Amino acid sequence: KIRVDVNIGEGGSSWYGTMHSGDMNSIRIGNVVNVQDGSVLHTLYEKSTIEIGDDVSIGHNVTIHGAKICNGALIGMGSVVLDHAVVGEGAISAAGSVVLSKTIVEPGSIYAGVPAKFVKKVDPEQAKEINQKIAKNYHMYSSWYKE
């Protein structure tokens, strides 16, 4: 379900049971982004927006609340990313992680846990390859549902 001020780029897909709630503030989603089943994107009135770059995968049952997700990032299943957090380019938020408000997830790194903490750097090319593969696969899957 999509409400009010939401913009989704080319090749984007939102799967079953997702909610993009742009009634409080804007949500901008880049190209070839997939928001998987059960995820919620929400903002705070006059305080936070959501900005999602290109080639991003947002796993099942993720909550993103007023955060920035940069190009090529992967938000693992069941993660929570809170207001004013930034998930850097090619970064991974591991499944079940809680990225607290104002946390900066470094580009090309893995953060995990509750609260999410730095785990390790990943090879930038390997991360890009994995994250783009997932994003492009979901782009392909979405074509199966077009009439």
Placement of each model-derived feature along the sequence:
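Short proline/glycine- and basic residue-enriched helix-capping loop/turn segments at helix->loop/beta transitions
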Residues: 57
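Glycine-rich hexapeptide-repeat left-handed beta-helix
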Residues: 23, 29-31, 37-40, 44, ...
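A positional/architectural concept
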Residues: 1-43
